[in-house]
């Protein structure tokens, strides 16, 4: 009933209409997968079945019904064999390959948003592989850019009874919060083994944590004491819930915190994402305008150079122009040229015929006078 009430409260408060994405992170052995299994069963029992995504390519069996399973897309063993990688390298490469198709996953989530109020994403056991990889960043930012996204950090309470180990977990939680910049919930799992009240006391009471540290005599305790002062402000705004993934206790409080985190996303994180998207769009449009302006200037320069070259070369005819000019002379000019040629030809012939005729007449007269004198 808590899940349904939280969802109804979220809708009534004008909260997000999209499904809330719960990105489950945690150290290996902290109980992430068991937590997702319990969460899935709880939501099914409440009549609000979640949309579940498994991003662990190395898991042998998934103990919950997954709508999308990375193992159906990427074969972890084949990736290791083909690229000659170890276990962690195989997980990173598998996530990288899957991230190239994550736009299709986003489309599936959008189609299912009317049927599912929550999207559960189970990540690989090697937390650093997902948190600090490029593919993990792509997946996280893709979800956060479209849907209310909450990071759930699952912590093994039974292994955090030592102040130094507890501080290490808190430092890792702080680094993930700083990296993702999303609403954050620390789930202290395995409360069926040990109650998480000691951890809450350490977070709220600095002196109680100092008393626990005084029992440690190693040099690490001095470093932990210094870091606890730095993280004191971090604790004040941190959402903490104690949960038993085996027994299912603490889930009601968890969904109350999820509702609060989703409202925080809509109130603080979504405007920031919209501002970033708008600034990126403005920068892109400005870049396009600058490119168009440079192109316009280049085209104007080319046109000006072409006009200058044409003016400077106008007295000189192109060979094609010469051919056209020779082929389009006026007929009168052609006839005049032809008549002139004929006159010149006749004048030349007459000039040669007149001396020959005079010689012929002289020879004839000479012969005539010669015959008469005889």
From Swiss-Prot:
A motif (Gly-Pro-Asn (GPN)-loop) lies at residues 86-88. It comes from Homo sapiens (Human). Residues 326-354 are annotated as: Disordered. Keywords: Acetylation, Cytoplasm, GTP-binding, Hydrolase, Nucleotide-binding, Nucleus, Phosphoprotein. Expressed ubiquitously. Belongs to the GPN-loop GTPase family. PANTHER family: GPN-LOOP GTPASE 1 (PTHR21231:SF8), XPA-BINDING PROTEIN 1-RELATED (PTHR21231). The modification N-acetylalanine is found at residue 2. InterPro entries: AAA+_ATPase, Gpn, Gpn1/Npa3/XAB1, P-loop_NTPase. The keyword DNA-binding does not apply. This is GPN-loop GTPase 1. Heterodimer with GPN3. Binds to RNA polymerase II (RNAPII). Interacts directly with RNAPII subunits RPB4 and RPB7 and the CTD of RPB1. Interacts with XPA. Residues 330-342 have a biased composition (Acidic residues).
